[in-house]
Amino acid sequence: MQLRIRDLREDRDLKQKQIAQVLMCDQSLYSKYERNERPLPLEYADKLADYYGVSVDYLLGRTNVKAPYPKKG
């Protein structure tokens, strides 16, 4: 599965270190997520989807629809 996290980050001219800070993880670990060397934890996928304003499905490459799903509650 090809993640879109690198494209989303680069489209916003952000550095890996900046996104790693959002996730509260090390930059080298985040880099491994971008290169698909380690699986992206669901908690991080959810956090990144909220950060970028996209759905988790879009982030994971399962749909081409960027819009996030409406939140319940």
Each model region followed by its residue ranges:
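Residue-level detection of the helix-turn-helix DNA-binding "recognition helix"
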Residues: 10, 24, 35-37, 64
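A short, Lys/Arg-rich alpha-helix, primarily the initiator
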Residues: 1-11
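Short alpha-helical DNA-recognition segment
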Residues: 14-32
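DNA major-groove recognition helix of helix-turn-helix/homeodomain DNA-binding modules
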Residues: 24, 43-58
